[in-house]
Amino acid sequence: MAATAVAAGTGSPAGTESAEGGPGAAAALELWLNKATDPSMAEQDWSAIQKFCEQVNTDPSGPTHAPWLLAHKIQSPQEKEALYALTVLEICMNHCGEKFHSEVAKFRFLNELIKVLSPKYLGAWATEKVKGRVIEILFSWTVWFPEDIKIRDAYQMLKKQGIIKQDPKLPMDKILPPPSPWPKSIFDADEEKSKLLTRLLKSNHPEDLQAANRLIKNLVKEEQEKSEKVSRRVSAVEEVRSHVRVLREMLSMYRRPGHALPDQQALQVVYERCEKLRPTLFRLASDTTDDDDALAEILQANDLLTQGVRLYKQVVEGRVSAGNAVPAAVGAIPAPRAFPNPEPCGLNCPLIDLETPSLLHQDLAALGINDVPTRNQVVIPSCCNDKKQPGAITLMGGGIQSLSADRNLLDLFSPQPSPGLNYVPQKSIPKEVPPGTKASPGWSWEAGPLASSTASQNTPLAHVFVPLESVKPSSLPPIVVYDRNGFRILLHFSQTGAPGHPDVKVLLLTMMSTATQPVWDVMFQVAVPKSMRVKLQPASSSKLPAFSPLMPPAVISQTLLLDNPHKEPIRLRYKLTFNQGGQPFSEVGEVKDFPDLAVLSTA
């Protein structure tokens, strides 16, 4: 039965490849594989493995022919030959390129591995050691290649059928594939070692061949240590993002009146875990000095973690200092008005430069906001205000200006968290403003998810929060908001309104990139007519990696809440700022293609 199964699985591909690559190439592959899996050898011949990998990479038909040769060896009744073949398969998966990888990730080849495990085929004769190695390999591939759906499906099927009882614990010396492409051959990474290895392999002395085997093992071990370091980094960064996200969600409950506060013990556990992750990131950063991209990822995670810890301290301390007062927006720096007894000016009080014009002046005019502040209109920290006149400030040449006149502009003064950067007031909006945009009165501006103002708190949106995972898109087609240079933004409609506020429309922004360059520092701002209210909740991220056809595209999601009490036709202006390939972009536009309100209400 075993021989029949192998013939059925390998006959067609082998014949095809012989036509393409010729009998000589196929014979060379078989020759090196026979040497690499020779069961009479006490130890595996690493030089034969190297030659086999080189033959796969140089022979045009190698990547498609080699998997079937390996499948035949893996199904061998001799335990040692099968185990040697599985080792060769792992190494080829690491170093024989994308085409070999894609062939192995097909059901046609995966079925050959499943036959070794299934009692209906070879499972009754295969040894437990061989079956254990096959399970380890399949499980490791599901971990390292999550984008290969067929591998995951095959593994899950084996678990559902009870053939795999539980996920194996991978041994420390296991050769794992890297998350990013390695050199064509691990033996070419170090030129000196490559030359030494070539010289040793050409020697006829047994001592030199033993030295070559030791050198190959050391090279494989070094690559293995590199992959483990990458795995630790990826795991730590993902844990940071996960814990900070949970911490922010729990802290956001403080600003929702009528909602139960989060469990204090659970909140403390999440916060303490965030604190413990900081030294982990420091160690990873000190060990990652030769990879700029990896170091940037670690530093970005550290900034995100620092912001989360700082937010926890601000919310907790603000709640203690101001009784039961809740900060206007979780994530924003508490406004001076939240503290009735401000401390006197000290050494850390920021100075106000009255000579510098506001960077917002031209931006607000370009976005069509009528309440553009004058040149000298600035917001003074509460510690510098005259205590006898808390509601007014005197400016040079500007007379007495009431703070209440700036309420519609406070959204843009509220700080915005940016991964990898500390917030600097008034500098989060780039100076570049597209020329020719005329001001249009009668629009209300929403600067971002952390906006805070007395005016906004008087609206239903101030205390409305819709979790991203609860948004269910409707059947209406999305609106294309922006589509240039491979960066695309869509606006989706939700099936229902906000919980407890059915008149508040829930919309979902999705941003994705098909550009070959990464996009970062993405910030989306919106404005609606004065008769409406709009609120942007925090985005899921602010960066998109460079597009890869081998990976699923990354997406930034952001929930938008819209209150339209007068049922007027919806109009929405936006300002989009981002950095792509080192070049900053600032775009302004308007979305007019909204469906009729009657259609929206029935969607």
UniProtKB/Swiss-Prot annotation:
GO BP annotations of the record are: Golgi to plasma membrane protein transport; intracellular protein transport; protein localization to cell surface
Residue ranges of every copy of the GAT domain listed in the record: 190-317
The molecular function terms in GO held by this entry are:
phosphatidylinositol binding; small GTPase binding; ubiquitin binding
Q: Which GO terms describe its cellular component?
A: clathrin-coated vesicle; early endosome membrane; trans-Golgi network
Top-level taxon: Eukaryota
Biased-composition ranges for Low complexity? 13-22
Location of region: Unstructured hinge: 318-473
Q: Please name the CDD domains in this protein's record.
A: VHS_GGA2 (cd17010)
Q: Which UniProt keywords apply?
A: Endosome, Golgi apparatus, Membrane, Protein transport, Transport, Ubl conjugation
Instruction: Tell me the segments the record calls region Disordered.
Output: 1-22
How the protein sits in the membrane?
Answer: Peripheral membrane protein
Q: Which residues form the GAE domain?
A: 474-595
Q: How is it modified after translation?
A: Ubiquitinated.
Q: Using the record's annotation, list all stretches that form the VHS domain.
A: 36-166
Xref: SMART domains = Alpha_adaptinC2, VHS
Residue ranges spanning the membrane: these are none
Places the protein is found: Golgi apparatus, trans-Golgi network membrane; Endosome membrane; Early endosome membrane
Q: Which PANTHER family match?
A: ADP-RIBOSYLATION FACTOR-BINDING PROTEIN GGA2 (PTHR45905:SF2), GOLGI-LOCALIZED, GAMMA-ADAPTIN EAR CONTAINING, ARF BINDING PROTEIN (PTHR45905)
- What interactions and quaternary structure are annotated? Monomer. Interacts with NECAP1, TSG101, UBC and AFTPH/aftiphilin. Interacts with CNST. Interacts with GGA1 and GGA3. Binds to clathrin and activated ARFs, such as ARF1, ARF5 and ARF6. Binds RABEP1 and RABGEF1. Interacts with the type-I membrane proteins LRP3, M6PR/CD-MPR, IGF2R/CI-MPR and BACE1. Interacts (via N-terminal VHS domain) with SORL1/sorLA and SORT1 (via C-terminal cytosolic domain). Binds the accessory proteins CCDC91, P200, SYNRG, EPN4 and NECAP2. Interacts with ADRA2B.
Q: What does this protein do?
A: Plays a role in protein sorting and trafficking between the trans-Golgi network (TGN) and endosomes. Mediates the ARF-dependent recruitment of clathrin to the TGN and binds ubiquitinated proteins and membrane cargo molecules with a cytosolic acidic cluster-dileucine (DXXLL) motif. Mediates export of the GPCR receptor ADRA2B to the cell surface. Regulates retrograde transport of phosphorylated form of BACE1 from endosomes to the trans-Golgi network.
Q: What is known of its domains?
A: The VHS domain functions as a recognition module for sorting signals composed of an acidic cluster followed by two leucines (DXXLL motif). The GAT domain is responsible for interaction with ARF-GTP, UBC and RABEP1. Required for recruitment to the TGN it prevents ARF-GTP hydrolysis.
Q: Which family does it belong to?
A: Belongs to the GGA protein family.
What name has this protein been given in UniProt? Answer: ADP-ribosylation factor-binding protein GGA2
